[in-house]
């Protein structure tokens, strides 16, 4: 077949999975319309659903949060760790720096910037573990808890679906980026059955819910940075304008594809992030930042199990439901998307390399940024240089972040850099989301090909419309509720993926139960 024919075949409409695409996109558009037309009703029902889920299943979310680390550790250090996603002599498709950069910028986004500065202030106002607000202990724990919420657990949750999907792509050489194909051991044989279609639709809606949450946090952040930098008015019109700019940016990147779009944005963003972190460390209270970070390492290691399983059953103060369970739900909602994206860029790496790379480099990146950003805002609050808690109570999270950054030397320069960083961070996240959503809605997609461009652009527009609907519905709690609700059906799907992976490993490598680990590159015989 000629190159031209292959190209035409790659983008022909017949490859679109019409049932998954149209049902999913229609659902997203209808929900967006309902949130826009009936914002108060949408907010009430979303928060009721979140309260019911966290009340009845909060304990379950906390237990689920422990499983990814255990399972990923077994994969990395067990007999299957040296299995390679590719042939024996195949090199990684992307350099380690680009690979880590794409994973980090696609997964954490500018939410890390927003929460890095704001989350500690929430915790000194409403501390965990029965601690007195604004006490010395509250300040110490306010620096530790963000590291816990953004550390090993979320990256392990992202890693969990990555391995079965990469195995499916590069060992079985399945021409698909559908989650349903990685759950085949528990699904009917017929791929066009209702079960396969429903599973992919649930995944799409879960991904959209997780991404919409990030947009709900990110748009006000970028707007506040622009207000501080340019002096424009902070209102709904400005927020919608930011969404439109964003949609154009990541829609263009999604149109360009993986290597020309996402990789370029990720490379730029990693460089900018290191610049911001170095500037905070050098221009900020260096000794204080080093001391509080060292202190937090000890607190974290000494209390990790307590934080992981703390349900607050006696006092019932609501901290686990409002924070830990919310975060675990957020990461779960994002997990299928991140698993698909991480797997797609992990060709040529071993299972052990992928697991350690995702959890190790990812956790290190969030640890460094949260230690510096959180330490800096706590320094300002604790030394009466900025009443961050008052700004949080009266104006909200986004204006607080802008004001904290404005306290650094050369505020105009650093505000400009952080604004650009935030824009690209989110553009990379939603670019990846549009790419993955389009892939799920595509039939028979080989690992070396990309989904139809207009399919990708359609999802970029869909995400932008959902963001506008969520902004009109308004409210921090509404955004959080969206995450928790969308995450619940994803949990059994991830369990199905893990079961299928173990089934594949036992079937394809029976010799590993008797002999020392070997490297297997060839697809198993059918």
Feature names for model-found ranges:
Residues 13-28, 188-197, 232-251, 255, ...:
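Loop-to-transmembrane helix boundary motifs in multi-pass membrane proteins
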Residues 2-15, 176-192, 218-242, 273-279, ...:
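Helix-loop-helix connectors at the membrane interface of multi-pass transporters/channels
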Residues 54-57, 64, 199, 203-207, ...:
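Membrane-interface loop-to-helix entry segments
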Residues 2-11, 44-50, 77-96, 121-145, ...:
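Flexible loop linkers connecting adjacent transmembrane helices
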Residues 115-129, 173, 280-303, 363-396:
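Extracellular/periplasmic helix-exit of transmembrane alpha-helices
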Residues 6-13, 38-53, 72-91, 142-150, ...:
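Membrane-water interface regions at transmembrane-helix termini and the short interhelical loops
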């Amino acid at each position: 077949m000629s190159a031209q024919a292959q190209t035409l075949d790659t983008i022909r409409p017949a490859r679109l999975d019409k049932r998954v695409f149209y049902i999913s996109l229609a659902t997203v558009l209808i929900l967006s319309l309902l949130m826009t037309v009936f914002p108060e009703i949408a907010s009430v029902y979303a928060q009721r659903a979140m309260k019911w889920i966290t009340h009845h299943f909060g304990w379950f979310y906390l237990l689920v949060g422990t499983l990814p680390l255990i399972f990923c550790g077994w994969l990395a250090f067990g007999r299957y760790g040296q299995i390679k996603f590719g042939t024996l002599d195949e090199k990684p498709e992307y350099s380690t720096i680009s690979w880590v950069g794409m994973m980090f910028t696609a997964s954490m986004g500018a939410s890390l910037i927003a929460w890095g500065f704001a989350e500690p202030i929430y915790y000194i106002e409403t501390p965990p573990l029965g601690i007195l607000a604004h006490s010395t202990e509250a300040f110490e724990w306010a620096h530790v808890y963000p590291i816990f919420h953004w550390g090993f657990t979320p990256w392990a949750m992202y890693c969990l679906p990555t391995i079965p999907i990469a195995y499916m792509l590069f060992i079985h050489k399945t021409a698909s980026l559908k989650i349903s194909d990685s759950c085949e051991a528990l699904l009917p044989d017929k791929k066009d059955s209702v079960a396969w279609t429903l599973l992919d639709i649930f995944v799409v809606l879960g991904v959209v819910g997780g991404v919409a949450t990030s947009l709900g946090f990110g748009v006000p952040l970028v707007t506040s940075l622009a207000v501080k930098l340019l002096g424009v008015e902070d209102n709904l019109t400005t927020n919608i304008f930011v969404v439109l700019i964003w949609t154009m940016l990541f829609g263009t990147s999604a149109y360009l594809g993986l290597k020309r779009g996402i990789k370029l944005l990720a490379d730029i963003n990693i460089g900018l992030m290191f610049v911001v972190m170095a500037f905070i460390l050098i221009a900020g209270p260096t000794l204080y930042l080093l001391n509080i970070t060292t202190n937090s390492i000890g607190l974290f290691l000494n209390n990790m199990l307590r934080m992981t399983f703390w349900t607050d059953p006696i006092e019932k103060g609501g901290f686990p439901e409002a924070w830990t369970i919310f975060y675990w739900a957020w990461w779960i909602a994002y997990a299928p998307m991140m698993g698909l994206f991480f797997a797609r860029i992990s060709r040529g790496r071993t299972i052990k390399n992928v697991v350690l790379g995702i959890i190790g480099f990812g956790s290190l990146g969030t640890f460094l940024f949260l230690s510096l950003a959180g330490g800096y805002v706590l320094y300002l609050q604790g030394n009466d240089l900025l009443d961050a808690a008052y700004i949080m109570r009266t104006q909200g999270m986004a204006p607080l972040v802008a004001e904290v950054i404005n306290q650094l030397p050369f505020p105009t320069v650093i505000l400009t850099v952080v604004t650009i960083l935030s824009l690209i961070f989110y553009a990379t996240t939603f670019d990846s989301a549009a790419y993955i959503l389009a892939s799920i809605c595509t039939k028979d997609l080989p690992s070396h090909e990309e989904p139809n461009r207009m399919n990708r652009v359609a999802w970029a527009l869909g995400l932008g419309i959902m963001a506008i609907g969520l902004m009109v519905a308004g409210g921090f709690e509404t955004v959080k509720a969206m995450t928790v609700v969308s995450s619940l059906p994803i949990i059994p799907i991830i369990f199905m993926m893990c079961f299928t992976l173990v089934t594949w490993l036992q079937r394809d490598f029976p010799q590993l139960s008797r002999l020392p680990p070997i490297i297997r590159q060839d697809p198993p015989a059918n």
